[in-house]
From Swiss-Prot:
GO terms for cellular component: endoplasmic reticulum; endoplasmic reticulum membrane. It comes from Homo sapiens (Human). Interacts with CYBB; CYBC1 may act as a chaperone stabilizing Cytochrome b-245 heterodimer. The keyword Cytoplasm does not apply. Induction: In macrophages, expression is induced after treatment with IFNG or a combination of IFNG and Salmonella Tiphimurium. Keywords: Chaperone, Chronic granulomatous disease, Disease variant, Endoplasmic reticulum, Immunity, Innate immunity, Membrane, Phosphoprotein, Transmembrane, Transmembrane helix. This is Cytochrome b-245 chaperone 1. It is found in: Endoplasmic reticulum membrane. InterPro entries: Cybc1. One of its GO terms (biological process) is respiratory burst after phagocytosis. The gene is CYBC1.
Length: 187
């Protein structure tokens, strides 16, 4: 699952993402290797602790982040939050939370982008296109597999922000002018 809808009202849309089953399975698998190495080795206690700690470190490093996206019309802001257990442990609980705040009126488009994921193929993510010309992904990592889940979230955000209604009159007149000037349509 790409993102889950936590709350949805007329003025607030709260989306969340937690590490998936693949991520947790990888954590358990890597940690099991460390525990097995410690249990079955004839090494000293220090080495056994090293095996478990090393595998725990690698396992947590491969754990996906917790992510949130909060679209709030009352404050006029989009808040994108990321929590990383790996960063939290690495900095001894001083860091681990990243937050990006964007004004709602700066969001011009919401689209789905395809990203190549090493060894696994293609992943998909929602990207916010801003008035400043920048693009910012809604989440830090792409989801594997079903593009339809990601497209559903993009449509949900587009309808919440009413972006489909924001086509300017100049764009409409330009598109109608180009259709009128098309020789194929003047038969």
């Amino acid at each position: 699952m790409y993102l889950q809808v936590e709350t949805r009202t007329s003025s607030r849309l709260h989306l969340k993402r937690a590490p998936g089953i693949r991520s947790w399975s990888l954590l358990v698998g890597i940690l099991s290797i460390g525990l097995a190495a410690a249990y079955y080795s004839g090494d000293s206690l220090g080495w056994k602790l090293f095996y478990v700690t090393g595998c725990l470190f690698v396992a947590v490093q491969n754990l996906e982040d917790w992510e949130e996206a909060i679209f709030d019309k009352s404050t006029g802001k989009v808040v994108l939050k990321t929590f990383s257990l790996y960063k939290k442990l690495l900095t001894l609980f001083r860091a681990g939370h990243d937050q990006v705040v964007v004004l709602l009126h700066d969001v011009r488009d919401v689209s789905v982008e395809e990203e190549k994921v090493r060894y696994f193929g293609k992943g998909y993510m929602v990207v916010l296109r801003l008035a400043t010309g920048f693009s910012h992904p809604l989440t830090q990592s792409a989801v594997m597999g079903h593009r339809s889940d990601v497209e559903a979230i993009a449509k949900l955000i587009t309808s919440f922000l009413e972006l489909h209604c924001l086509e300017s009159p100049t764009e409409l007149s330009q598109s109608s002018d180009s259709e009128a000037g098309d020789p194929a349509s003047q038969s």
